[in-house]
Amino acid sequence: MVAQQLQERCGGTSQEDPVETTKSLICALNYISRDLPLPPHLFTAVSSIYHGASSSSLSDSDVSPPLPTSPPANKAPYGADLMGEFEDALLKQRPDCESGSRLIQLLDNRNKSHIQRRLSELEELPSTRGEDLQAKCLLELYGLKLRELQGKVRTAVSSEFWLRLNCADVSSQVFDWGMMRLPRPFYGVGDPFAMEADDQFRKKRDAERLSRLEEEEKNLIETAKRKFFAEVLNAVREFQLQIQATQKRRRQRNDGVQAWHGRQRQRATRAEKLRLMALKSDDQEAYMKLVKESKNERLTTLLEETNKLLANLGAAVQRQKDAKLPEGIDLLKDSESDLSELDAPRSEPLQDLLPDQDIDITESDNNDDSNDLLEGQRQYNSAIHSIQEKVTEQPSLLEGGELRSYQLEGLQWMVSLFNNNLNGILADEMGLGKTIQTISLIAYLLENKGVPGPYLIVAPKAVLPNWVNEFATWVPSIAAFLYDGRLEERKAIREKIAGEGKFNVLITHYDLIMRDKAFLKKIEWYYMIVDEGHRLKNHESALAKTLLTGYRIKRRLLLTGTPIQNSLQELWSLLNFLLPHIFNSVQNFEEWFNAPFADRGNVSLTDEEELLIIHRLHHVIRPFILRRKKDEVEKFLPGKTQVILKCDMSAWQKVYYKQVTDMGRVGLQTGSGKSKSLQNLTMQLRKCCNHPYLFVGGDYNMWKKPEIVRASGKFELLDRLLPKLRKAGHRILLFSQMTRLIDVLEIYLTLNDYKYLRLDGTTKTDQRGLLLKQFNEPDSPYFMFLLSTRAGGLGLNLQTADTVIIFDSDWNPQMDQQAEDRAHRIGQKKEVRVFVLVSVGSVEEVILERAKQKMGIDAKVIQAGLFNTTSTAQDRREMLEEIMRKGTSSLGTDVPSEREINRLAARSEDEFWMFERMDEERRRKENYRARLMQEQEVPEWAYTTQTQEEKLNNGKFHFGSVTGKRKRKEIVYSDTLSELQWLKAVESGEDLSKLSMRYNRREENASNTKTSTSKKVIESIQTVSDGTSEEDEEEQEEERAKEMSGKQRVDKSEEEEEEGEEENDGKAIFKWNTHKKKRSRYSFTCSSSDSRAQSSNGSRRK
C-alpha cells in the first residue's frame, strides 16, 4: 500500500525509475536535514531502495497510517536504523568515482598522448607544402619537443627569483639572532657564574668580529668607489678626445659643404636675378634660355603646361576666326563640339583634350624642338593677329582735329581685331582719348570697310553728353542718336529710328539696355562698344547676362581706364564677354594655372613664380587688350602730385566721435534730451570727420558763417586754402562721397561769395553737358566744381582745372584715381596738384592706408596661380574693432603747422611766401583767435548720456550687431528677380524698381517667419535706440517719393542708379539692414558701397 501511495505521490511512475528514485532520496534528505521524521510512504520508498524489495502492502486508503510509537527497549532507535539504511542507499546509488589525484594523472596522461600524436603528425607531414605553412609546422614541432626543457627552465628561474627575493641580504640575516633557533635553552645548564663569563666573552668576540666585518665592508666599498670613479674619469677623457676629433672632422666637412653651397647659392642667385631681369623686361627668349640652363623643375613644368594651353587656345581662336557666322551674328553653334576639349579636366592626358589636328600640331612641334617653350605663345599670337593692315592716316570723316601717333596705333590695333574677326579691350589710361579712338574706328569702318553700322554704345549716364559732343565735334556727318530721357521721349526716338531707319550710332546707358531690351534686341547690331567695361567684371550681373544672351551682336569692344586686377575670375569675366565660347568656364580657367602644382604638397610660390604666372596670364589676354599709360605716350603732359593734408578735429567733432565709438549714438537738438542711434559705425565715424552738421536735422540753422567753419577741421583747412588758391589763379575740382556734405559745402561757398557748379547723381543728363561747357569756357567765372565721386568721377573732361581736392577718400582707390584724372588728361597745360584731406588719428587714416595697400603689389596673395586682392569680412570687422578700441586717444595728434601746409600746397617759392603773408594777415585780422570750436562752445544738446541698460552693461557698446549698412532705396538691376520674371517684366514695360521691391519684401517677410535667431539681435538694436532713427526718416521720404508723378519717379530712379554705379572692389563686410516693423534681415555687401549708400542717401535728401 505504501508503494502504491509512493507511486501516486511520485506521478504514477514505477519504482525502478531512476529519476523518481532520486527524487525520493532528495525528499528524504530534506526531512532528515531538518530533524523531522519521515512520512510512512517515504520511509517505505527508501527502505525498498535499500532492501531491493517492497515492504508489505498496507491496507486500503481509508485505513489511516499507524502513528509512530516509541521503539521497544530491546531494539535500536528509530533514527539509527533510518540513518544506516539511508547511508547504504546512498552508497548503492553513488557511481564509482575516481579520486582527485587519479583524475589529474588521467588528465596528464591524456595531454601527453595528444602531444605525442601531434608530434607524430607533424613529423610525417610532407615537405611539399607552402613555405608559410611549412614554417608554422616547424615552429609548432620544435615547441612541442622542447616542452620539458621549457618547464625545467621556468622552475629554475622561479626558484632563483624566490631565493633573491627572500635571501637578498645574507650578511644581515646571519647576525640576526632572532632568526636562530637553538635546540635547547641555556637555562639550567652549567654554573651561573661561568655562564656570565661566557656571555661577556661571547659578546666581546661578537663585537670584534662585527667591527672587523664592518671595516672590511667599508674598505671594499671605498675601493669599489675609487675604482668606479677612476673608470668614469678615464671614460670621460676618452669621450672628450673622441668628441674633439669628431668635431674637428665635422667642422672640416661642414666648412667644405657650406663653401660648396655658398658657391651654388651665388650661382643660383645670379641666375635668378638674370631670369627676373629678363622676365621684367619681357625678354622671353633670354628667359627661356636661362630656365633651360637652371634646370628648375617647377618653372619648366609651369612653362610647359602654359605653353600647351596657349597652343590650344590659339587653335581654338583660329577655328572661331574661320567659322562662318550665320547672317553676320556671333553665334558659334557649329563650333561648340570643337571647343569642348577646353572644358575637359586638366587631369586627363593632353592628347585626350585635343582634336586630331591639334595632336598633330603638338607632336610635330615636339619632334622639331621639344624644348621650345615659346612655340605655344607664337602660335597663339599668330593665330589672333594673322591679318595685318597698316593705318598711317586718320579717316577723312574726322573733322574735329588730328589724331596723335599713339591714337593712330590704337586705331590700327582695333582694325586688326576687326579684320581677324575678334573682339578686344581698349584699356588706355584715363585721359588718353579712348572716346576719340573709338569714334575714329567707326569712321574708318564706315569709310574704308563699308560698314555703316548700326553701332551700339553703352556708357555710364554721366558721360553720355560727352559722347554726343565728341560725335558732333569730330564726325558731324555720322548720324548718332542719344537714346535717353523719359518714357515719352524714348518712345519718340524709337518711332523716329523705326520710321527713318537711317542711323549709324545709338548711344545709351546701362539701365536702358536692360529696361528697353524689348526694342533694342530687335536690331542686329554690328558693333557694340561698352564704355567703363570694368562693369562687366562680374559675369553673374544682370548687365553681363543681358548683353551676352539678349542681344544679337557681331563684334564687341570694351573701353576701360581701370587696370585689370590680378583676379582670375575678373579676368575670365572679361574674356568670357569677348569670347564666350572659348572662355566659358571659370573653374577650368583656374585649373589651367593650378594644374602644374596640383600634385605637390607645397603650393607656396616664389617671387619669380608669381611674376611668371602673372606674365603668362597677361600673355593670354595681351592679344585682346591694348593699354598705354600717360608717361609712355604723352611725354609733355604736365605731372600730377598728390599731397595728403592732415587736419585736426573740432571739439564738436571729437564729442560726436567719442559718442559713436563708446555708445553708437549722438546727441541731437530735439528738445527732449534724446539721442539718435546709429548704424554702420564706419560710415558714422567718417561723417564725424567731415562735419557735425551731417547729424543735425533740417530745422537747424546752418547759415552761420563762423560756426560752419569752426565746427569742422576740414572746413577750417579749406577756409585757409581756398583764398590762397583763388589768389594764385588755380581752379578746383572738389570730390566727396556724401551729397549731404556737398549741400553744406554749397552753404559755405555761398556765404564766402565763391562761384561754383555742382554735379551729382540728381543732375539731369542734358544738364551735365551744359555744366561742363560752362566750367570749361575760356573766361569761366566759376572757381570751383563740386562733384560726387560716383557720378562725377567717370568720363568727364575738366582739364581746365589744375587742382583736385578729395574731401573724403573712397575705400576703392580706383575711384579716387578716376576722379583725379578728370583734370590730369590730354589738354592739361598746368601741373595738377591733388589734395587729400584726412583727419589725424581717425578712421580716415585707416581707409587711406588700406587704399595704399590695395594699390601696391604687397596686397596681392598668390597661391598656386590664384590671385586675391580682397580682404574678408572678418578683416573688415577686426579693423572696425581696432578703431573702436582706439577711440579718441589719437585724435588731433601730429597735426601739421600752417607753414608745413603752405609748403605742401605751394607749387613755387613765390606761392609759398604769398601763402605765408596771407596767413599772417588773416591771423592779425582774427586777433589770433582759435580757429576750431572749443569744448565750452559745443552745444549742450550735442552731449548724450548713457541709458540705464548701457550702464548695466558698464557702458560697453556692442557694436558688432550694428556694423551694417543703412537702409537705402533699392536700385534694381533685376538680380533679385528670376530670369523668367525679369523677361516678362521687361517685355510688358513694368517698373522694375517697384517689382523688385515687391518680390524682395515678400522674400523678407517669408524669411522673417522662419528665422527666429535674428530676434535677439533685433532686441539688442532696440535697446540702443531711444529716439527716431535716421532710417525711419528715410523710409518716410521714400513713401513720399512713391507719390511723385511717373516722370519724376523714372528720372529719380535713373539718377540714383547712376549715383550707385561702382565696381566691386571685393571688400566684403557684414551688413545689417535697417530694422523695421515688418521685416528684418542681414546680408553681406561690398565695402565700397559705404560711399554708395551715403551718396544715394544724400541724393534722396536733396
UniProtKB/Swiss-Prot annotation:
<feature type="domain" description="Helicase C-terminal">
    <location>
        <begin position="717"/>
        <end position="884"/>
    </location>
</feature>
<dbReference type="GO" id="GO:0042393">
    <property type="term" value="F:histone binding"/>
</dbReference>
<dbReference type="InterPro" id="IPR029295">
    <property type="entry name" value="SnAC"/>
</dbReference>
<feature type="region of interest" description="Disordered">
    <location>
        <begin position="55"/>
        <end position="76"/>
    </location>
</feature>
<dbReference type="Pfam" id="PF00271">
    <property type="entry name" value="Helicase_C"/>
</dbReference>
<protein>
    <recommendedName>
        <fullName>Probable ATP-dependent DNA helicase CHR12</fullName>
        <ecNumber>3.6.4.12</ecNumber>
    </recommendedName>
</protein>
<dbReference type="InterPro" id="IPR001650">
    <property type="entry name" value="Helicase_C-like"/>
</dbReference>
<keyword id="KW-0217">Developmental protein</keyword>
<keyword id="KW-0347">Helicase</keyword>
<dbReference type="GO" id="GO:0010078">
    <property type="term" value="P:maintenance of root meristem identity"/>
</dbReference>
<feature type="region of interest" description="Disordered">
    <location>
        <begin position="1002"/>
        <end position="1102"/>
    </location>
</feature>
<dbReference type="Pfam" id="PF00176">
    <property type="entry name" value="SNF2-rel_dom"/>
</dbReference>
<feature type="compositionally biased region" description="Polar residues">
    <location>
        <begin position="1006"/>
        <end position="1027"/>
    </location>
</feature>
<feature type="compositionally biased region" description="Basic and acidic residues">
    <location>
        <begin position="1039"/>
        <end position="1052"/>
    </location>
</feature>
<feature type="compositionally biased region" description="Polar residues">
    <location>
        <begin position="1082"/>
        <end position="1102"/>
    </location>
</feature>
<dbReference type="GO" id="GO:0006325">
    <property type="term" value="P:chromatin organization"/>
</dbReference>
<keyword id="KW-0378">Hydrolase</keyword>
<feature type="domain" description="Helicase ATP-binding">
    <location>
        <begin position="415"/>
        <end position="581"/>
    </location>
</feature>
<comment type="function">
    <text>Probable chromatin-remodeling factor that is functionally redundant with CHR23 in root and shoot stem cell initiation, and root apical meristem (RAM) and shoot apical meristem (SAM) maintenance. Plays an important role in mediating the temporary plant growth arrest induced upon perception of stress. May promote seed maturation and repress initiation of germination.</text>
</comment>
<dbReference type="InterPro" id="IPR038718">
    <property type="entry name" value="SNF2-like_sf"/>
</dbReference>
<dbReference type="InterPro" id="IPR049730">
    <property type="entry name" value="SNF2/RAD54-like_C"/>
</dbReference>
<dbReference type="GO" id="GO:0010492">
    <property type="term" value="P:maintenance of shoot apical meristem identity"/>
</dbReference>
<keyword id="KW-0067">ATP-binding</keyword>
<feature type="compositionally biased region" description="Acidic residues">
    <location>
        <begin position="1053"/>
        <end position="1064"/>
    </location>
</feature>
<dbReference type="GO" id="GO:0005524">
    <property type="term" value="F:ATP binding"/>
</dbReference>
<feature type="binding site">
    <location>
        <begin position="428"/>
        <end position="435"/>
    </location>
    <ligand>
        <name>ATP</name>
    </ligand>
</feature>
<dbReference type="GO" id="GO:0016887">
    <property type="term" value="F:ATP hydrolysis activity"/>
</dbReference>
<keyword id="KW-0156">Chromatin regulator</keyword>
<dbReference type="GO" id="GO:0009651">
    <property type="term" value="P:response to salt stress"/>
</dbReference>
<feature type="compositionally biased region" description="Acidic residues">
    <location>
        <begin position="1028"/>
        <end position="1038"/>
    </location>
</feature>
<dbReference type="Pfam" id="PF14619">
    <property type="entry name" value="SnAC"/>
</dbReference>
<dbReference type="GO" id="GO:0009414">
    <property type="term" value="P:response to water deprivation"/>
</dbReference>
<keyword id="KW-0539">Nucleus</keyword>
<feature type="short sequence motif" description="DEAH box">
    <location>
        <begin position="531"/>
        <end position="534"/>
    </location>
</feature>
<keyword id="KW-0341">Growth regulation</keyword>
<dbReference type="InterPro" id="IPR027417">
    <property type="entry name" value="P-loop_NTPase"/>
</dbReference>
<dbReference type="GO" id="GO:0010231">
    <property type="term" value="P:maintenance of seed dormancy"/>
</dbReference>
<dbReference type="GO" id="GO:0005634">
    <property type="term" value="C:nucleus"/>
</dbReference>
<dbReference type="InterPro" id="IPR014001">
    <property type="entry name" value="Helicase_ATP-bd"/>
</dbReference>
<dbReference type="InterPro" id="IPR000330">
    <property type="entry name" value="SNF2_N"/>
</dbReference>
<dbReference type="GO" id="GO:0004386">
    <property type="term" value="F:helicase activity"/>
</dbReference>
<keyword id="KW-0547">Nucleotide-binding</keyword>
